[in-house]
Amino acid sequence: MTDFKVGDHIVDFENIYQIYAVKTQKDLKGAPVKCFFYRPLEASERDKSVVASVPIDNVAKSGLRHLISKDGVKEFFKLLGKPLDTALLFEPKLTKEALYLNDPIKTVPILKLLFQNKIQTAEKFAKTNSEVMERIVKHLSDEIAFVTKKSFKSIHSQILSTLKKSST
């Protein structure tokens, strides 16, 4: 998982970033450690100075990953379009845990369960579940729009319409 390089776009469970440097720093014991430095891709004027770093040896634990590939986007929509496995149960706690895995493909069943729960409970759909679902859709829309060079709005609509079709 250390195949990142300067210029790469990476993503965590919230934002898309760009690696702008690899530097050697000292850890708490004074030992040299190579680190990636990255910043949000769409930083506001106020956030332009916001940067983060992660030791190369800890990238696997950081939750950062490369953006989904174009083939991954196809697989995502293919899985999203399939009917929900009726054996799956809605577990709100597991939903949040799975989101932190930051894997679009593993997010599909969670998104489908949330959507199904929204349909079944209608106006009783919990506000927190609604917020989580919208956050997932927004994050996936941002990432897929960036990868496919399509608009956020069109990807957002495509995700929601695919969810609706697979739920009927």
What residue ranges belong to the model's regions?
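Generic alpha-helical secondary structure signal
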Residues: D8, A21, P40-E42
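Short, surface-exposed secondary-structure edge patches
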Residues: M1-D3, K26-D27
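Charge/polar-rich, low-complexity and marginally structured segments
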Residues: D57-T168
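Short, acidic/polar N-cap/turn motifs at the starts of alpha helices
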Residues: G7-H9, C35
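Short solvent-exposed strand/turn elements
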Residues: D27-D57
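Short glycine-/polar-rich loops that comprise or flank the Walker A/P-loop
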Residues: E14-N15, K34
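Short, well-ordered loop/turn sites that connect or cap secondary structure elements
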Residues: D3-F4, V11
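Short beta-strand-centered aromatic/proline hotspots
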Residues: N15-Q25
